[in-house]
Amino acid sequence: ANKAFFELCDNAIAKDPDLCDAYVLKARRIYGNLFTSVYQHQRTENELLFHNLSFKAYSINPNNPEAVVMYSRSFNLKKDYPQRLKYARQALDLNPSHDVSNNDYGWALCNEKRFEEAEYYLLRAMEMNPIGRRSYEGLMPFLYMAMADSHKSLEWCNILYDRGSHSRYDGWRAAIYVHLGDFENARI
């Protein structure tokens, strides 16, 4: 699937080397691949490619919120959190009604431990895109753990578990139950 997708992007770039969206789409797919075990053997190569694609997209059109989000994520991977926050904010300023920019800015705020502020933007992103909100919900248990709100974290973890049980949710829920002092449920 990746090969065919990348070929389509490359064909679009060959026809128009300044087509920002083709670089953004390719960068977005590579970014997702960085966090899957299937592509870990290519992590270094893919990370470099992501940085190059996100920079290219941003240099073509710094007024495209999607390009700015990708560029922001490049700084996140480099652990340059002030730049990450700067560009995430730029993407949000370009289009405050863009769900991806709200989500990205929320997670950038987490790097600064500004969790309550982050919660606002993350929930806002979900409200803006009710059909795609599930793609934003997966990390919510961690946000609430960072906020020391174990009850809210458990609530989100249960929502995710009920949608599709996976052993990782059992582990997360056990850890949350321990935080809550409920050792009986932690053992289940």
Task: Please identify what each model-predicted range represents.
Residues 50, 161-165, 178, 183-188:
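TPR/TPR-like (Sel1-like) alpha-helical repeat modules
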Residues 1-128, 140-144, 155-158:
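Acidic, proline/glycine-rich low-complexity intrinsically disordered segments
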Residues 35-37, 146-153, 180-187:
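Alpha-helical linker/edge segments of TPR/alpha-solenoid repeat scaffolds
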Residues 98-104, 133-139, 164-175:
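Alpha-solenoid helical repeat architecture
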Residues 113, 129, 147-149, 161-164, ...:
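Alpha-helix capping/termination and helix-coil
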